[in-house]
Amino acid sequence: MSVSFENKETNRGVLTFTISQDQIKPELDRVFKSVKKSLNVPGFRKGHLPRPIFDKKFGEESLYQDVMNALLPNAYEAAVKEAGLEVVAQPKIDVTSMEKGQDWVITAEVVTKPEVKLGDYKNLEVSVDVEKEVTDADVEERIERERNNLAELVIKEAAAENGDTVVIDFVGSIDGVEFDGGKGENFSLGLGSGQFIPGFEDQLVGHSAGETVDVIVTFPEDYQAEDLAGKEAKFVTTIHEVKAKEVPALDDELAKDIDEEVETLADLKEKYRKELATAKEEAYKDAVEGAAIDTAVENAEIVELPEEMIHEEVHRSVNEFLGNLQRQGINPDMYFQITGTTQEDLHNQYQAEAESRTKTNLVIEAVAKAEGFDASEEEIQKEVEQLAADYNMEVAQVQNLLSADMLKHDITIKKAVELITSTATVK
């Protein structure tokens, strides 16, 4: 194989390589044997057409495209490796010569990984706005949240207040004409929940069961139903019931109702304190890691980040998001319909963070390379076993899904992140 690379501009160039006749001839034989099985040529049994007759009747060249399709992927990968390139986007391939009896010549316009000039990435000073200490207020807030979850709704005679639930019938109209979706019966509405159009819930505060209220609201300009957007509507609303939350007493019985593993309120508080301490410690570590990596990225210089890398990152993020939806049993088309968004909106959303994420990945990879980090066979095996345990998969399944190179890359990245983080100090 002959390989050459010519730089055209920063992070871009043309890779030229050949596929030799030593590779082409056996592949031609294989393709011919496959093709002749389906050929019907007068005078010959199906599948028994001699090669010279085929070449005379159809031409050896008729097999070239199938041969090229079979050989090109591996030939391109080998050329990239021999040229010592790190390609970061799909190449633009052009077959420049496929002459009979000669090596085939291919060119590929490629985008290469940009140069990263590292600044300081060890012993960084960072600031984080995350508290490690667990306060009594933190514990009480957690218990109060669980206590409210156990609250019961009881009918009250007094007027409705924010936080109450009202059971209502309503009929909506615009200029005296009812509209689709504007009617409901025995609907439970939490006042202050924001379930309804802004202003609707506020107008029920201060009213009691048995009252009928004319609620006047204006649909938001960006309302999903375009025929209603920006229009004023009247909802004739009848209140059937007003219900208030009744929370249980703060005692040992409540503690046992919240968590059957504890006996007293004091036990529950101690358990929550430990859980919150663990969660806060993790949040603190994550904040330090994020701040340290952000600082390392700020200290580095990336020479002309290619747009193609950002596009690849957006594409990867969108596919990951849509894949997660499908794994949860959510049809992407249904998601877009419900949220009133499009796939283009999703691309635009990820576009904003793709450049930052791409820069971060490049800097971490550069740190791993600068430090000479590698991964041993033992480390790779340990990573496979951990992934299998995390995702409830067989070890063999993980090995089939992830190549050794991918696993090695992930391990070296983790080592780089650990180095940046562990040497950082918090101001």
Curated annotation (Swiss-Prot):
Catalytic activity from the UniProt record: [protein]-peptidylproline (omega=180) = [protein]-peptidylproline (omega=0)
Domain PPIase FKBP-type: 163-248
Xref: Pfam families: FKBP_C, Trigger_C, Trigger_N
Sections of the chain in a coiled coil: none
Keyword line: Cell cycle, Cell division, Chaperone, Cytoplasm, Isomerase, Rotamase
Source taxon at top rank: Bacteria
GO CC annotation terms, alphabetical: cytoplasm
Keyword Glycoprotein in record: no
Assigned EC number: 5.2.1.8
TM helices/strands, residue ranges: none
Subcellular location: Cytoplasm
Keyword Cell cycle: yes
GO biological process terms on file: 'de novo' cotranslational protein folding; cell division; chaperone-mediated protein folding; protein transport; protein unfolding
InterPro entries cross-referenced by the UniProt entry: PPIase_dom_sf (IPR046357), PPIase_FKBP_dom (IPR001179), Trig_fac (IPR005215), Trigger_fac_C (IPR008880), Trigger_fac_C_sf (IPR037041), Trigger_fac_ribosome-bd_bac (IPR008881), Trigger_fac_ribosome-bd_sf (IPR036611), Trigger_fact/SurA_dom_sf (IPR027304)
One function term, GO molecular function aspect: peptidyl-prolyl cis-trans isomerase activity
PROSITE patterns per UniProt: FKBP_PPIASE
Functional summary from the UniProt entry: Involved in protein export. Acts as a chaperone by maintaining the newly synthesized protein in an open conformation. Functions as a peptidyl-prolyl cis-trans isomerase.
HAMAP family from the UniProt entry: Trigger_factor_Tig (MF_00303)
PANTHER family (alphabetical): TRIGGER FACTOR CHAPERONE AND PEPTIDYL-PROLYL CIS/TRANS ISOMERASE, TRIGGER FACTOR-LIKE PROTEIN TIG, CHLOROPLASTIC
Stated family: Belongs to the FKBP-type PPIase family. Tig subfamily.
Description of its domains: Consists of 3 domains; the N-terminus binds the ribosome, the middle domain has PPIase activity, while the C-terminus has intrinsic chaperone activity on its own.
Protein name, per record: Trigger factor
Source species of the chain: Streptococcus pneumoniae (strain 70585)
Gene name of this polypeptide: tig
